[in-house]
């Protein structure tokens, strides 16, 4: 179970708020099921993000360029609020999504301690694949305390509505936009032609070009 239009802006934010609303004001099975779905979504976020940097593939209608900021999607802003309950030094500055973040301040739902632990500080190295159902693409992640590699996904044809993105390398820095982080594009300029699922344990590859941020340099190049 999960969202058909997974990781999608702006749909994720409004659906997430609806689930919080059901958890807060419904009862019985509806409250229980909404809580389980919220738990699952937050656990997936914990695995696919690094210090609130989050740039996964998503499903949504074509026609708009994907956002270039990597630290303020509508899921991130809520986790920043909940994370600040565990770490008082955590900055909750956000470039957008304040109206969604407000929900996290007044509802009784809170992610589990273990989920927040993985959001704030990865306890051990890991490599995971998270599926999103038929005619979709997986999220593939490799990371530990010092980095996270996030696969960009693969479009499955126009009817799939999958928006493939670059493979991202997140580091312990203050990068807030895609251009500030190392990333790898798929071949060509059209994301519909991309298969950016080439993330393995501690390693990633693609057929496209590599973007090196202005203030960084590659250790080796060819």
Where do the PLM segments sit?
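Ser/Thr/Asn(+Pro)-rich, low-complexity disordered segments
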Residues: 45, 85-222
